[in-house]
Amino acid sequence: ALTHKVDPATWKDDALEFARGAAPLLEAGRLAAVLLEFPFSFHYKEEERRYLGRLLGELSSFPLAVEFRNAEWYGARVIEGLKERRVALCSVDLPRLEGLPPLSDLVTAELAYVRFHGRNAAAWWTGDSGSRYEYRYSPEELGAWIPRLEAMSAEASKLLVFFNNHRRGDAADNARALSRLAKAARLA
């Protein structure tokens, strides 16, 4: 694994194996981005910062997006580092809970990447991985994203938007609702 359970002895081999496997998709124009999703337990500490830098270097031939689930990573130094490397900072929509990333529409690369995880605050820390992401966005919640998406789209050459999907399948309905709002705003 490259982001969740990293083995210091094998991560580089894992990254090279991943790169070899994904290269044909990139060469065929079928790979929009590689998302590196780091869990809440990935802290802004020297060892983790060093690892992130090495991993981004190993995968630098790919269009990269980095998703941090820990607010510690949302400082000016990290943002500038991502811009210098032309790596997208994944904007995440999550519950507004202590320690989680802030709502952000920062664009750090030609690619902008947004993930909607839902705002199920009651199950975020106590639920399992399925119930944590069960969430049906209201039209108002999604509508508030339209100006953000417009601004991101104006700054980036490509905007990717994803919804986290689990047992109830809310992602498809949420995506359709956002698509309707985006079309009404002439964004899509």
Regions flagged by a language model, labelled:
Residues 1-188:
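Residues lining hydrophobic/aromatic ligand-binding pockets adjacent to catalytic sites
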